Amino acid sequence: MCKYLHMERDSRKIIKRLLSEGWEQVSARGSHHKFRRDEVSLIVPHPKRDLPIGTARSIARAAGWL
């Protein structure tokens, strides 16, 4: 079974988790929200219910969830 099947893909829930873990939203331009913590930054497309699995995986890796 693929370990990515149960990965969160809803941008609203991803953003909520990032903010609860201390990430700071530094900008939002159009549908892309940029977050930063320490020296790491990442971009989350929002609003989007079903992010592509590759995008969700990339966000999870940058956030340290994988």
Where are these regions (language model features)?
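Short, intrinsically disordered or compositionally biased N-terminal tails of bacterial proteins
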Residues: 1-7
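Amphipathic alpha-helical segments
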Residues: 10-22
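Major-groove DNA-recognition helix of helix-turn-helix-type DNA-binding domains
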Residues: 21, 25-40
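C-terminal structural segments of small proteins and small subunits
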Residues: 38-66
